[in-house]
């Protein structure tokens, strides 16, 4: 069986400064791997390179054993992304947003899928509202719905609960737990929230200054480094 996501020797240099330095890791099927580290450590740059939004200075990204740089269009349905920092089209309704993304990924039974996601993510009351008028928590749930509308085998999460109130953040984490178990999705979660990583991830990569400084289970790393030093 091919590995859903593999990163090999990935580096990114900006103006002679290395933002990411020769990192390698795998995310196996039905596994959630966390990247934990402070702001500026290279988490978002790493995700940007995996998505193809940033061109690596060196190294490669494989999806199911295929180098994504060479087969990006063919691999479109295998990979999706969630981030609170990516804006949704503001003038479309929630339903229109989901229809656009569903058609982009050629989702079968799109109407049923939108109804399912609306129920699971509590979107029924806002389904016909203009996206630009929604609260940050509502936008977060819409972003989550559009990113999983095609049930991608690999999902990248960049600070998925950032700026959410505790109740909404807990709801999103609970949904992700249930969804991942049901679909056996391979997830890479970038966060600086230790509690979030501990709850969701089976293994963690600790990043600092663009490098992976340690990796292992959350239990092992907490014992080794101390919770305070990992937050």
Where are these regions (language model features)?
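Conserved ABC transporter NBD signature motif
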Residues: 59-70, 74-75
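Catalytic Walker B motif of ABC-type/P-loop ATPase nucleotide-binding domains
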Residues: 155-159
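Helical segment within the ABC ATPase nucleotide-binding domain
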Residues: 170-183
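ABC ATPase "signature
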Residues: 215-216
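Conserved ABC ATPase signature
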Residues: 130-134
């Amino acid at each position: 069986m091919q590995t859903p996501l593999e990163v090999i020797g990935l580096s990114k240099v900006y103006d002679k400064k290395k933002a990411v330095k020769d990192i390698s890791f795998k995310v196996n099927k039905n596994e959630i791997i966390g990247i934990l580290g402070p702001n500026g450590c290279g988490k978002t740059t790493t995700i940007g390179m995996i998505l193809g939004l940033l061109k690596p200075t060196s190294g490669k990204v494989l999806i199911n054993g295929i180098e994504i740089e060479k087969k990006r269009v063919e691999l479109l349905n295998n990979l999706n992304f969630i981030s609170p920092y990516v804006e949704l089209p503001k003038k479309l309704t929630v339903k229109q947003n989901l229809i656009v993304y569903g058609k982009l990924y050629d989702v079968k039974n799109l109407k049923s899928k939108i109804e399912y996601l609306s129920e699971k993510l509590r979107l029924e009351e806002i389904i016909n509202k203009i996206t630009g008028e929604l609260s940050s928590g509502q936008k977060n749930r819409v972003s989550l719905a559009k990113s999983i509308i095609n049930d991608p085998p690999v999902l990248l999460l960049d600070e998925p609960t950032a700026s959410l109130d505790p109740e909404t953040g807990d709801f999103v984490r609970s949904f992700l737990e249930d969804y991942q178990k049901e679909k056996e999705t391979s997830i890479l979660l970038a966060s600086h929230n230790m509690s979030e990583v501990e709850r969701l991830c089976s293994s963690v990569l600790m990043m600092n200054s663009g490098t992976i400084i340690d990796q292992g289970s959350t239990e092992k790393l907490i014992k080794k480094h101390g919770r305070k030093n990992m937050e």
